[in-house]
Regions:
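Multi-pass membrane glycosyltransferase architecture that uses lipid-linked
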Residues: 2-235, 253-396
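A cyclin-like helical interaction fold
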Residues: 242-249
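Cysteine-nucleophile protease catalytic domains, especially the papain-like/related folds used
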Residues: 236-242
């Protein structure tokens, strides 16, 4: 009994230590500059408080839950903390600290879910991952805010002791879409798996209805601005996957955004026999790998999947992304490293290629199985090498 108590106290102290380190690193790193997104959120919040349209006059590309979250955080006041030297020296001062703490708490909740459903190790692979720390503490992007609700919806659906779990899970998935539409195709993936027609209808209608309603009241009077900001204005076509594997004719005659959307739907069909939780992890990887455009903050999206399926390829993905974050202009932007490597935007876009390639290989391994993947890969290598050898043979 004494040994068990000592063991429990040790594990509890270790847990508290890791949680403290995770929060501390996220707050500590926010002192090293800020991202353009934070400046845009400040500007959009000012418009919102003035009663002006964030879609017509601002550069706001999400549904309304995030602007309401920013507004609530702005109203919170802690004078004792606001006047400290550390806070006053941080870009954005206490308002930014509140955002960092809020997003850190979101990360902590995901960590708890991973800890309870898997292990402390898997939870820490997410919570102490440098990608997560930098995106939350420095960049202040809120992708995990949306992913948290999506993850909760999956876990609750798998709990067969909960009544009306299909409805509750669909509501949570709808909230996820409203916060940020990362999982925009996932209701379709889910619907493909359901056997009953009524369940298919629920998992499609409920989430998408919540997503659409989350634009109220702007959707009524400012539909054009909502449509342009959310779906049109910010689109680019520089996705690394399509640059590596897309023939030139694709880039000439097809929209990469359309191809990305079609591919995500097709993958939902292909993974119809996979468990819902597995499909959720695969989706988080696929939405980044096959994206028609790429920003550094996208690289945080598959972190839950990385933690669950952790192997040397995901370690390499983490290392490459962390090194990119040190020099990229949207992230830590360390000048002495940028000067050494003469880093610029073009270098960042080139760096995306090996990162996405590593993630793609890991994705194929997990989705089709390592044995099948390596058997197929060996056949391809053997075929190509035979063709090369036959093409260079000559008679003496």
């Amino acid at each position: 009994m004494v040994y068990k108590n000592q063991r429990f106290n040790y594990e509890l102290n270790l847990f508290i230590l890791f949680v403290f380190v995770g929060f501390f690193l996220r707050v500590w790193i926010c002192q090293f500059g800020s991202n353009m997104d934070f400046a845009l959120w400040q500007a959009n919040l000012d418009l919102f408080k003035e009663g002006r349209s964030i879609y017509e006059f601002g550069n706001y590309t999400y549904a309304t839950p995030w602007i309401y979250t920013l507004y609530i955080l702005d109203t919170l006041s802690f004078p004792a903390l606001e006047n400290t030297k550390f806070v006053q020296n941080i870009p954005g001062e206490f308002y930014r600290i509140k955002i960092v703490i809020f997003l850190s708490f979101i990360d902590f909740l995901i960590f708890l879910l991973l800890f309870r459903n898997y292990s402390l190790k898997i939870g820490l692979l997410f919570f102490l991952n440098p990608i997560s720390i930098i995106i939350t503490g420095h960049h202040n992007q809120f992708s995990q805010y949306a992913i948290l609700f999506g993850f909760l919806s999956i876990l609750l659906y798998e709990n067969k002791n909960i009544n009306k779990r299909i409805l509750i899970s669909s509501l949570l998935l709808g909230i996820s879409l409203a916060v940020k539409h990362i999982l925009i195709f996932f209701p379709l993936w889910w619907a493909f798996k359901e056997k009953k027609i009524i369940n298919k209808i629920i998992v499609i209608v409920v989430p998408y209805s919540i997503f659409i309603l989350s634009f109220f009241p702007f959707l009524i009077n400012e539909f054009q601005y909502v449509y342009e900001n959310v779906l049109i204005n910010w689109k680019r076509e520089d996705g690394p996957f399509w640059g590596m594997f897309g023939p030139k004719i694709i880039h000439m005659y097809f929209s990469l955004q359309t191809l990305f959307s079609l591919l995500l739907v097709i993958l939902g069909f292909l993974f119809v026999d996979k468990k819902l939780k597995e499909s959720f992890y695969f989706y988080l990887m696929a939405v980044v790998i096959f994206s028609s455009m790429m920003y550094t903050q996208y690289l945080v999206i598959p972190l839950i999947a990385l933690a669950v399926y952790w192997n040397w390829k995901f370690l390499l993905y983490t290392l490459l992304t962390f090194l990119l974050f040190l020099v990229d202009g949207d992230q830590l932007n360390l000048e002495f490293l940028r000067d050494i490597f003469e880093w610029d935007l073009r270098a960042t876009r080139i760096a995306f290629y090996p990162i996405i390639l590593v993630l793609f290989i890991a994705f194929l391994e997990e989705t089709i199985g390592k044995k099948k993947f390596y058997t197929f890969t060996n056949k391809i290598i053997k075929f190509v090498s035979q063709k090369i050898r036959s093409s260079i043979k000559f008679k003496i």
